[in-house]
Regions:
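C-terminal helicase lobe
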Residues: 1-25, 29-173
Length: 173
C-alpha cells in the first residue's frame, strides 16, 4: 500500500507523468491535466467507460482516451458474468434479474466497441439524448469520424504492453 500511495502522490503532483494502473486507481483522484487514458481491454459497461475516460481533459485542454479491445474481451466479460457466484442475500429470481441487467450493460459496451458510427452520437443515444441540437456531433473528434474506418487487429501490441506491465511487477507509478 505505501508504494501505491507514493505512486498516487507522485502522479497527482506531476512528479510522475505516467501511471499504469487498474481502474480502481483513478477513483478519487482529482487531477485536471490528465492527457491520456488508455484502456487495455473492454470495460464492463459504457457507464464505467464514460467515468474512466472522463478522467482525461478535465481542464478543457485536448486529451485522448484510447480503447484497445478484441473479441476475446467479450468472451471473457460474458464468462465472468455467467460465473458470478450465488448471492445468499438474493433470491434466484433476483440473481437472474441482476445478471440480465449486467448483460444489458455489457451489450451496450459491445455495441460501442463495434460501431462504425460517430462515437459521440452512440454515447449520447445510449444515455437517452436523441438527436437534440448540439449532442452527438463531434466534427471529427472521435476516431470513427476523424478517419476512414478500417478494422485492425492490435492484439500483438496490446499483449506486448500487457507483458511489459506484468514484467515490471504491476506496481510501479
Amino acid at each position: 500500500a505505501p508504494t501505491r500511495e507514493q505512486a498516487q502522490r507522485d502522479f497527482v503532483t506531476d512528479r510522475t507523468p505516467v501511471v499504469v494502473a487498474t481502474n480502481a486507481f483513478g477513483m478519487g483522484i482529482d487531477k485536471s491535466n490528465v492527457r491520456f487514458v488508455i484502456h487495455h481491454n473492454m470495460p464492463e459497461s459504457i457507464e464505467s467507460y464514460y467515468q474512466e475516460a472522463g478522467r482525461a481533459g478535465r481542464d478543457g485542454e485536448p486529451s485522448r482516451c484510447t480503447l484497445l479491445w478484441n473479441e476475446s474481451d467479450i468472451v471473457t466479460r460474458r464468462r465472468l458474468l455467467d460465473m458470478g457466484g450465488p448471492n445468499e442475500r438474493l433470491t434466484a429470481d433476483e440473481q437472474d434479474l441482476v445478471r440480465r441487467s449486467k448483460r444489458q450493460l455489457l451489450d451496450g459496451m459491445i455495441g460501442y466497441c463495434r460501431t462504425t458510427e460517430c462515437l459521440h452520437r452512440y454515447m449520447t443515444r445510449y444515455f437517452g439524448e436523441h438527436d437534440t441540437p448540439g449532442t452527438g456531433h463531434c466534427a471529427g473528434g472521435c476516431v470513427n469520424c476523424a478517419s476512414t474506418f478500417a478494422t485492425m487487429d492490435v492484439t500483438p501490441v496490446a499483449r506486448a504492453i500487457s507483458m511489459c506491465v506484468h514484467d515490471l511487477g504491476q506496481h510501479f507509478g
